[in-house]
From Swiss-Prot:
Basic and acidic residues bias: start-end ranges: 1-16
Region span, Disordered: 1-34, 90-130, 195-225, 283-334, 371-451
Principal cellular location given in the protein's record: cytoplasm
One Gene Ontology cellular component: nucleus
Listed name of the protein: Zinc finger protein YPR022C
Natural source organism: Saccharomyces cerevisiae (strain ATCC 204508 / S288c) (Baker's yeast)
Bias type Basic residues, positions: 90-100
GO molecular-function term, one example from the UniProt record: RNA polymerase II cis-regulatory region sequence-specific DNA binding
Keywords (A to Z) from UniProt: Cytoplasm, Metal-binding, Nucleus, Repeat, Zinc, Zinc-finger
Keyword Disulfide bond on entry: no
């Protein structure tokens, strides 16, 4: 009965995919497979792209698993790596679609099941359809001995299969045969106690239905990697780490950990099996053998139609895949989330420039018939493969509907303003299909261009600067009057701004903002050819670096209406144009760091909107207007380099926007204290940004691109963000174990371990500054994911053993070390200008050529280039220091303790303040929490205000808060200063007691009846006024015991950690300084520091900066003896 239902569904699906006259789907809305013998059509282009791999696979992936029953390799082949990974999981008996059955289901299906054997999580339920189906429960009759288990490779924590501790000799093959005949309903679910979790269980301690986990069992560092597998939990199809515990003999210190990053990048190999008969080496298949096996399986699939239909029913994507594994199913949540995650490379076009260079650098194409004619690999009944259908070079074009098809016009879905006509993008998409068809037909008529001579001509043509590049520096900022009029129509206030100020603002953007991130492609940028909205965003951002006057006259008038201008624009409607998202990100950055509190909060509220627009962009969402022709190889894919450059720029720019949104999401959450991330690190499956020397260069010659890795087949395999992040975490674990780092060693007088094996870790050669910063954002994302889990029993129960207890380190210590590792090994420095800004030597040459024209415009680079003139010792990536603090304490606690009347619009009462005070005191007493956080805070202040002149440290006080080119640095200075004051005040109290607290009382400090949190004291009588005036006079006349310069230099001599140390010595030194901090006297002499910070932030144009100024003044008063903790007028700015 069920077989008939399945056959009926398959026939229905085939009819849906059939392009026939009777088909209900309009051909104009579907994509047809270009194979001459295939009539499949698909509703989405990416479905067609996956389906075409069945005809023209780019690579054949072979399963290397050795079957225990036959001692023979599986050798099943797949055309997609994710299918192979999913298939291999079935071998390892992890991530089953179905879980253990309930007691009722067991008894209803077979009453004797409970008598035969208890439930074993290692059993693999198989199912192909809904309803009742046969489930084969395969159980090993003999369990591996403990010695073999220790030497075998650990599986990821979230994918652990059961490994019993005791060998149960009562299990006989006859029982296995009985279990294989059992039938259960398909709708089986895992118990609620274990969401997403399959781990090593111990049946003698567990119930048949709900296995338990004993946290006392320690498997030599296994739980340390279980922690990381919680982070990379395969919800997006990326596995965590695998740990090799080989020949450790119970000594965790000598155990080497081999953590494989991203199983998507590698296949399971070198497995150890319980029986010695399984130890035979597995010979890898050669390329010819893989191809031969591929064609043989094609023939086999055609002869076994029913098996093919079962595979199609389980593997929805791609349709009718003859190489799929019948055990896999795309209905599982993990694999489905991969397809739905629009930040993954499954939906992003492959790098056009990389594909073009690979084809251009390879040898002349040879027909597949000539190559394999002597091997007889093509079955007799198989049609010979044509030259353009070669194994490595599939056809790249797809057919589109005819010109005479009438496309209905959709009605507009949205009008923001009656006077504004917002176009319907869906209608535009359909109207452009004919244009795509004409473009496709032109490309299909191109002859054989892959000859050696033609390739040589292409290589030679690449030596010239592309025609759409604009080497003239004036094209980047000297905007025309016509373009200004277009901007004035959006923001009329700009009419009163001089054209020179607009030019200056644009140039400031390229000098101060662009070198930090490289969002735009500068060589192809021409200011007069950009949309007015993008130009407004660039002017607003550039003017924000030039002082309060430019912010008031230019940035603020643009920022106020610009967000609503973007929201009401036609190009905002999804799928949004790239410049729309670029502009939104720039607006958000300015709103958060340079405006008032209203716009600051508005920016965070609308951050989710930008993320959603990004998820719906053409390249990330499979938009039909983006030509996904699959031109990765083949003759017809070689085309004009100019077109390749344009597609590559669009591809790379959109990827950088996605990364910048992720970077803002994580780093701004750390700096500003927002804890709800919109994007997690395991959702980012994009390749890292291309090298800066390529992105910023006007020279895209063949030789230059080859020098930077383009054309190499290995480039795209190892430069994904997630694989790089996981490799970084692997190195961190390896260094921690090899050096046996323990934080309690610092109590014995400093560094005891000698750093070893640092050279054996990865040599990080990331050639993109922004790519390096993205890895830091990934670590921060892990931090937030850990903090979300830390309060649950799920986290506490399972992460006590292994490396965390064995080395005396918590997960916070591991992440803290990971940040230090990133700073020392990946970024190299957070102060060196060469390491913190993009250098463009090719542009410098072009600028020198145009120096006369530049001078004629009257704009001097020295006055505008604040980033280059920034002190070389200043920290340019403050988020690295703030992250170390957030890892140990939230901003909320010391922000309230310093006197803020409310946080996140929630007023603070007396009870809440008392509770926070106790937490701050406990935190400050702990040297490995409060002490370490304070040491990192001091390191940041040392970098910001101390320089060495002839090796003599000197304090620099000339800091202009309104012209800081690093937008998060003012907030970071305020946070670190407040943390230092809070910890020292909690431990030691005030500096002096000269404040008159006669009229102050604890009850007056907090007024519960005031729902608005105003809490303003009402001392208006003459006595109160006299006391207040006297206190004010005492505060103004007070000379601190130690000025800011004296105090900071004294702390520098005691707490400075040399950043030139290797990462292990640096980490140990930080712990040593944290222990030493408790023995430094008079650390609470902070009145001079509070006066200095108050004066800096009182001059801030930014409203939040002036709020900090009032808060610092409140801290000064409390250091003078004031007992009232709250700064009642903090937000009156």
């Amino acid at each position: 009965m069920h077989g008939k239902e399945l056959a009926g569904r398959l026939r229905k699906r085939e009819n849906d995919n059939d392009l026939s006259p009777n088909s209900s789907s309009s051909p104009a809305e579907r994509f047809r497979c270009p194979h001459p013998e295939c009539n499949k059509t698909f509703s989405r282009q990416e479905h067609l792209s996956r389906h075409k791999l069945n005809h023209w696979p780019k690579e054949i992936y072979v399963c290397s698993y050795v079957l225990p029953t036959t001692n023979a390799p599986c050798n099943k082949t797949f055309v997609r790596k994710d299918l192979l990974i999913r298939h291999e999981k079935r071998h390892s008996k992890v991530k089953n679609r179905l879980s253990r059955p309930s007691k009722d289901q067991i008894s209803s299906s077979n009453k004797d099941f409970s008598k035969n054997a208890p439930y074993n999580p290692s059993e693999v339920p198989l199912s192909t359809q809904s309803g009742t189906s046969t489930i084969n429960l395969i159980k090993n009759s003999v369990n591996p001995p403990p010695s073999i288990t220790q030497e075998s490779k650990f599986r990821p924590f979230l994918q652990q299969a059961q490994q019993p501790q005791q060998v149960q000799q009562s299990q006989q093959p006859q029982q296995i045969q009985q279990l294989q005949q059992l039938q259960f309903p398909q709708q089986l679910r895992a118990p609620l106690q274990q969401p997403m979790l399959q781990q090593q269980m111990h049946p003698q301690q567990a119930s048949p239905t709900f296995p338990s986990y004993d946290p006392r069992i320690r498997n030599n560092g296994q739980n340390g990697n279980q922690f990381f597998n919680l982070i990379f939990d395969n919800r997006t199809g990326v596995n965590g780490f695998e740990v090799d515990a080989a020949n450790n003999n119970g000594n965790g210190n000598d155990q080497n950990m081999n953590i494989n990053p991203a199983v998507q990048q590698q296949r399971y190999q070198d497995r150890n099996f319980a029986s010695s008969s399984y130890q035979q080496p597995l010979q890898p298949l050669t390329q010819d053998q893989q191809q031969e096996q591929y064609f043989q399986q094609q023939k086999l699939a055609q002869q076994q139609q029913q098996q093919q239909q079962q595979q199609q029913q389980q593997q929805q994507l791609p349709p009718q895949n003859p190489f799929g594994d019948p055990l896999t199913s795309s209905s599982s949540g993990a694999n489905l989330s991969v397809m739905q995650d629009l930040f993954s490379t499954n939906f992003l076009n492959s790098d056009p420039l990389q594909s073009f260079m690979q084809e251009l650098s390879e040898a002349p194409q040879v027909s597949i018939e000539d190559t394999f004619s002597d091997k007889n690999t093509i079955p007799p009944n198989e049609k010979p493969v044509q030259q353009d259908e070669g194994f490595q070079n599939p056809p790249v074009m797809f057919e589109l509907p005819q010109d005479n098809i009438k496309i209905p016009k959709a009605q507009p879905k949205f009008n923001d303003n009656p006077s504004t006509s917002v176009k319907d993008n869906l209608s535009s998409q359909k109207l452009n299909i004919n244009e795509l068809k004409r473009r496709s037909s032109k490309d299909s008529g191109v002859g054989n261009n892959s000859s050696l001579n033609y390739k040589e001509q292409l290589r030679h043509s690449m030596k010239s600067v592309p025609s759409f590049f604009h080497p003239d520096p004036l094209t980047k900022y000297k905007i025309s009057k016509e373009k200004c009029q277009e901007m004035f129509s959006f923001v009329p206030e700009l009419r009163y701004v001089s054209i020179e100020s607009i030019h200056k603002s644009l140039k400031s953007f390229w000098l101060n903002f662009h070198p930090q991130y490289g969002l735009l492609h500068k060589p192809s940028f021409h200011v007069d050819k950009q949309p007015a909205i993008l130009n407004l965003a660039l002017i607003m951002t550039g003017a924000s670096f030039l002082g309060s006057e430019y912010r008031e006259q230019i940035s603020d008038p643009i920022c106020g209406p610009l967000r609503w201008i973007i929201f009401s624009h036609a190009d905002f409607q999804p799928p949004s144009k790239t410049y729309i998202i670029q502009s939104l990100l720039l607006v958000e950055g300015y709103e958060k760091t340079s405006t008032n509190r209203y716009l600051h909060e508005r920016s965070f509220l609308h951050h989710g909107t930008t993320i959603q627009l990004l998820r719906r962009t053409p390249s990330l969402g499979g938009h039909p207007l983006m030509v996904k022709t699959g031109k990765t190889s083949g003759e017809n894919s070689i085309q004009d380099p100019q077109e390749v450059y344009k597609r590559w720029i669009d591809f790379e720019m959109l990827k950088r926007i996605a990364f910048y949104a992720f970077y803002m999401d994580t780093t701004h959450a750390v700096v500003f204290g927002y804890w709800n991330l919109f994007i997690n690190s395991n959702q980012i499956q994009l390749t890292l940004p291309c090298p800066d020397q390529v992105w910023e260069s006007y020279d895209l010659s063949y030789e230059t691109l080859m020098e930077h890795g383009y054309g190499s087949t290995k480039r795209d395999e190892n430069n994904t963000f997630l694989s790089a992040l996981m490799q970084l975490m692997k190195n961190v674990i390896q260094i921690l174990r090899n050096n046996n780092i323990r934080r309690n060693k610092v109590n014995n007088g400093g560094i005891e371990s000698t750093p070893t094996d640092l050279e054996s870790t990865t040599d990080w050669n990331i050639q993109s500054l922004f790519g390096k910063k993205i890895l830091l954002a990934g670590i921060i994302s892990i931090l937030f994911q850990c903090q979300e889990e830390v309060n649950g029993d799920y986290f506490i129960t399972n992460f006590r053993g292994g490396i965390t207890d064995h080395l005396g380190l918590s997960w916070k210590d591991i992440l803290s070390f990971a940040m230090n590792y990133w700073l020392h090994e990946v970024q190299k420095s957070c102060t060196d200008p060469k390491a913190c800004r993009i250098s463009t030597p090719s542009e410098e040459t072009l600028t020198n050529r145009k120096i006369d024209e530049d001078n004629g415009d009257g704009l001097c680079d020295d006055d505008l280039d604040l980033l280059s003139s920034d002190n070389p010792s200043n920290c340019k990536i403050p988020v690295i220091h703030i992250s170390q603090i957030v890892l140990r304490i939230l901003h909320h606690d010391y922000y309230i303790y310093a006197g803020a009347p409310w946080r996140m619009n929630v007023p603070i009462g007396r009870d809440e303040y008392d509770m926070i005070s106790r937490r701050i005191l406990q935190f400050a007493k702990d040297p490995y929490n409060g002490g370490v956080a304070v040491v990192y805070a001091f390191q940041f202040l040392f970098e910001m205000f101390i320089i060495k002149e002839n090796n003599v440290p000197t304090v620099v006080k000339s800091y202009n808060i309104n012209s800081d080119p690093v937008i998060t640095r003012p907030y970071a200075i305020a946070l670190t200063s407040l943390l230092i004051w809070s910890c020292n005040f909690a431990l030691h109290g005030c500096e002096v007691s000269i404040w008159d607290n006669t009229e102050a009382s604890k009850d007056e400090c907090f007024q519960p009846d005031d729902s608005n949190g105003g809490n303003i004291l009402g001392n208006t009588d003459n006595n109160g006024s006299t006391i207040a005036n006297n206190n004010l006079k005492e505060k103004n006349n007070y000379i601190p015991i130690e000025s800011f310069e004296v105090y900071l230099l004294r702390m520098y001599r005691n707490l400075y950690v040399d950043s030139s140390l290797d990462v292990v010595s640096f980490q140990n030194d930080v712990w040593a300084k944290a222990s030493l901090l408790q023995h430094i006297s008079n650390t609470h002499f902070l009145c001079g520091m509070m006066q200095f910070m108050r004066d800096i932030f009182n001059k801030s144009y930014w409203d939040l900066g002036r709020e900090f100024g009032k808060l610092f003044d409140n801290c000064l008063e409390r250091s003078l003896g004031k007992t009232s903790p709250t700064c009642h007028n903090m937000f009156d700015v």
